[in-house]
C-alpha cells in the first residue's frame, strides 16, 4: 500500500521495459522489502557482508557482491531507500531538515527550508515532487551506464536526454556550441578562433598519446594551456573548462581537465545529439533503488528502519537497535551517515558542498532543447555580482522529468565555495536565473524578433545571447512564485571533482586492526559521502575499490552470466535505439500565503 509520504515506486508505476528481441514482453520489476513487500520479520543469523546505508555506492556494491555469490545483509536506519542519494517528497524533506538541525543526520548542517502553502494544503501535494539530495547527470559514455546495461538495472529505469549547457558571462546566458557544424556556422566566432577550437577538439580526443603537447603544461593550469598552446580566448576557455569539463575553478590541472573535456565530447552522439542523460522520477535515489532491487534478486536481504548499534571485531557480531544480532564473516561497510553512536573511526569530512534547491511555479521551457526537460547552467568565477571565486552550477529539471507537476520546475544550485560567501554566490546565481526567467516571460517578448524565433515546427526558441544582452537595462514588472526553497551544507571527504581512490579505503583498512576502547565502530570500513561532482563518475570507482577490499580482486565485478547472454551481447546495436526511445533577487519573490519555514530560512 502506498504511504502518504511516499511516491509511487518503479514497480508500482506503469510497466516500462527495454527489450533486445523483436517481440518484447513487459518487464516485471522485482519487488523490494519496505516498499511493495513487507520487511523481513527476522534478521539472518550469519552473513558474509553487512552494508549500512542504501546510497549509490553502497547499492552498487551490494548488487555486485550479491551477484558474485556473497550473502549480503543491506540495512538502512531510514524508512526509505537512498540515504545520502535519496529522492524525497516535500514532507520527507521537512522531516529530514528537522533531523539535520537536531544533529541526528551527520555530514549535513545549516538546513533551512521554506514551503509555500500551495504545497500540502493547496493545489499541489507533497508527493507531486521528488527532490534529490545529491542530483547527478549520467554521461552517455561512462562506467556506470555500462554497468546499468550489463546488470539490466537499466530495464527498471527511464531516461531523458540532456543537450543544453549554458554559460553565464557578462550578464549573458550563452548556449554551448556542441558540434563541428555549430562551430563553423556560429557567426559570433572569428575564423581563427574556429580553427583553433577545432584544432583543440581534434587533440583532446586522443590527448594522452600526444605527450609532447600537454606534458610541458602538466603542472600548470588548463587556462594557461588553452591560451598559450591553442590561442583560445576567455569565452572559449571558460566554456571548455566550466561548461564542458564541469570543473569548479581555473586552477584545475591540465591532465584532469583534458580527461573531463574528453568525457563530454566522446559522450556526444553515442545515443543521439546529446552528451548526457537524466533518469526520470529521480536521480541517484532512483538508480540506487534499482541496484537494490537487482541485489535482492541476487539474494541480498533488505531491512529498513534498522540501525546499527555496534560491531565487535573479535566476535564479528553486529548488534542492531531492536536487539537483533548477526555474525559477519567478512566485512562491515558503513555510510558515514549511518555510523553508530560512539563511533571513533568516521573519516574527517573536510570539504563543503553548499546546495540550494528551488521549485518555481513556471515551466521555464526556454532553458530546454526541443523535446527535452533538462538543462545545465554554469556560472564561472567572477561572473556574478557577488564576485564568486568558485563556479556555481545549476541543474534544471522540468515536468518531463516526472519530479514535478506541469507548470513547475526544479532548480538545483551548488558550489564548493567554503564558508559564508558560498550562500552569497548561490543567491547571486539564483537572482540571475530569476531575471532571465522574468525577462523571457514578460509581456511583449513574443514581438521581439531578435530574441524570439520560431522553428520549422512552430516551436519557440530563445536567442540566449540577445536575451542576456538586455539584462543590465531590464527591470522586471512581475515577481517570481517560489513554491519551495531548501538550503543546506553537505560535508564530504572527497575534494571537488576529485577521484575516489584506494588510498582512502587503505586508511579504513588500517582502522580495522586498530581497536579503540569504547568505540562502537571498531573493525568497520566507511564509504564516502557524495562529492560535489555533478556526474556519477565517482560511484563505480568507489564501489569497485570497496569490492576489491572485500573479495580480494575486482576481476569479477559485475561479471554476470544471465541465461540469455546472447541478448546482452546484442546490446551494442540495440541500446542506442532503446535509449533514444526512453529518453522519450529576494524582492522579486512572491510567496503566496504565509508558507511554512523549517530552520531559519530568510526569503
UniProtKB/Swiss-Prot annotation:
SUPFAM superfamilies: FAD-linked reductases, C-terminal domain, FAD/NAD(P)-binding domain
GO MF annotations in UniProt: GDP-dissociation inhibitor activity; GTPase activator activity; small GTPase binding
Keywords: GTPase activation, Phosphoprotein
Residue numbers carrying Phosphoserine: 470
An annotated GO cellular component: nucleus
Domain of life, source organism: Eukaryota
A Pfam family reported for this protein in Swiss-Prot or TrEMBL: GDI
InterPro entries: FAD/NAD-bd_sf, GDP_dissociation_inhibitor, Mrs6
Gene Ontology annotations of biological process type: endoplasmic reticulum to Golgi vesicle-mediated transport; protein targeting to membrane; small GTPase-mediated signal transduction; vesicle-mediated transport
Family indicated by similarity: Belongs to the Rab GDI family.
More info: Present with 23800 molecules/cell in log phase SD medium.
Function: Substrate-binding subunit (component A) of the Rab geranylgeranyltransferase (GGTase) complex. Binds unprenylated Rab proteins and presents the substrate peptide to the catalytic component B. The component A is thought to be regenerated by transferring its prenylated Rab back to the donor membrane.
Protein name: Rab proteins geranylgeranyltransferase component A
Organism: Saccharomyces cerevisiae (strain ATCC 204508 / S288c) (Baker's yeast)
Amino acid at each position: 500500500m502506498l504511504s502518504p509520504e511516499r511516491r509511487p515506486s518503479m514497480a508500482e508505476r506503469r510497466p516500462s521495459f527495454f527489450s533486445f528481441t523483436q517481440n518484447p514482453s513487459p518487464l516485471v520489476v522485482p519487488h523490494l522489502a519496505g516498499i511493495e513487500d513487507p520487511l523481513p520479520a527476522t534478521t539472518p543469523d550469519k552473513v558474509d557482508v553487512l552494508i549500512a546505508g542504501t546510497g549509490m555506492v553502497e547499492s552498487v556494491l551490494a548488487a555486485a557482491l550479491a551477484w558474485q555469490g556473497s550473502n549480503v545483509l543491506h540495512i538502512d536506519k531510514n524508512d526509505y531507500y537512498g540515504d545520502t542519494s535519496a529522492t524525497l517528497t516535500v514532507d520527507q524533506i521537512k522531516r529530514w531538515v528537522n533531523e539535520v538541525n537536531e544533529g541526528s543526520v551527520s555530514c549535513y548542517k545549516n538546513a533551512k527550508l521554506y514551503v509555500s502553502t500551495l504545497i500540502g494544503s493547496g493545489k499541489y501535494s507533497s508527493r507531486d515532487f521528488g527532490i534529490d539530495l545529491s542530483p547527478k547527470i549520467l554521461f552517455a559514455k561512462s562506467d556506470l551506464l555500462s554497468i546499468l546495461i550489463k546488470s539490466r538495472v537499466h530495464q527498471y529505469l527511464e531516461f531523458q536526454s540532456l543537450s543544453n549547457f549554458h554559460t553565464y558571462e557578462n550578464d549573458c546566458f550563452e548556449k554551448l556550441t556542441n558540434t563541428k557544424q555549430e562551430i563553423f556556422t556560429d557567426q559570433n566566432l572569428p575564423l581563427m578562433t574556429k580553427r583553433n577550437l577545432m584544432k583543440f577538439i581534434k587533440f583532446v580526443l586522443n590527448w594522452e598519446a600526444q605527450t609532447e603537447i600537454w606534458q610541458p603544461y602538466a603542472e600548470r593550469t588548463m587556462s594557461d594551456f588553452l591560451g598559450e598552446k591553442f590561442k583560445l580566448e576567455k569565452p572559449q576557455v571558460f566554456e571548455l573548462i566550466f561548461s564542458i569539463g564541469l570543473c569548479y575553478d581555473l586552477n584545475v590541472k591540465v591532465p584532469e581537465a583534458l580527461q573531463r573535456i574528453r568525457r563530454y565530447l566522446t559522450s556526444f552522439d553515442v545515443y543521439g545529439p546529446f552528451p548526457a542523460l537524466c533518469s526520470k522520477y529521480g536521480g541517484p535515489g532512483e538508480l540506487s533503488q534499482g541496484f537494490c532491487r537487482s541485489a535482492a534478486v541476487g539474494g541480498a536481504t533488505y531491512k529498513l528502519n534498522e540501525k546499527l548499534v555496534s560491531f565487535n571485531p573479535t566476535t564479528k557480531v553486529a548488534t542492531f537497535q531492536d536487539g537483533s544480532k548477526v555474525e559477519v564473516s567478512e566485512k562491515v561497510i558503513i555510510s558515514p551517515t549511518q555510523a553508530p553512536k560512539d563511533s571513533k573511526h568516521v573519516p574527517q569530512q573536510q570539504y563543503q558542498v553548499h546546495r540550494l534547491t528551488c521549485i518555481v511555479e513556471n515551466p521555464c521551457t526556454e532553458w530546454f532543447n526541443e523535446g527535452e526537460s533538462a538543462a545545465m547552467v554554469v556560472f564561472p568565477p567572477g561572473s556574478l555580482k557577488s564576485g564568486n571565486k568558485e563556479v556555481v552550477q545549476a541543474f534544471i529539471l522540468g515536468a518531463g522529468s516526472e519530479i514535478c507537476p506541469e507548470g513547475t520546475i526544479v532548480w538545483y544550485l551548488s558550489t564548493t565555495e567554503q564558508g559564508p560567501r558560498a550562500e552569497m554566490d548561490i543567491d547571486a546565481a539564483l537572482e540571475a536565473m530569476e531575471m532571465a526567467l522574468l525577462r523571457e516571460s514578460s509581456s511583449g517578448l513574443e514581438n521581439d524578433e531578435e530574441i524570439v524565433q520560431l522553428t520549422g515546427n512552430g516551436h519557440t526558441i530563445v536567442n540566449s545571447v540577445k536575451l542576456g544582452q538586455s539584462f543590465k537595462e531590464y527591470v522586471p514588472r512581475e515577481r517570481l512564485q517560489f513554491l519551495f526553497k531548501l538550503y543546506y551544507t553537505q560535508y564530504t571527504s572527497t575534494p571537488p571533482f576529485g577521484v575516489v581512490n584506494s588510498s582512502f579505503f587503505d586508511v579504513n583498512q588500517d582502522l580495522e586492526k586498530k581497536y579503540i576502547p569504547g568505540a562502537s565502530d571498531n573493525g568497520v570500513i566507511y564509504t564516502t559521502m557524495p562529492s560535489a561532482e555533478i556526474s556519477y563518475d565517482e560511484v563505480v570507482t568507489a564501489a569497485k575499490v570497496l569490492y576489491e577490499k572485500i573479495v580480494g580482486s575486482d576481476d569479477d565485478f559485475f561479471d554476470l552470466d544471465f541465461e540469455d547472454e546472447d541478448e546482452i551481447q546484442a546490446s551494442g546495436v540495440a541500446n542506442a535505439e532503446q535509449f533514444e526511445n526512453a529518453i522519450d533577487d529576494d524582492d522579486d519573490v512572491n510567496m503566496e500565503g504565509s508558507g511554512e519555514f523549517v530552520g531559519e530560512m530568510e526569503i
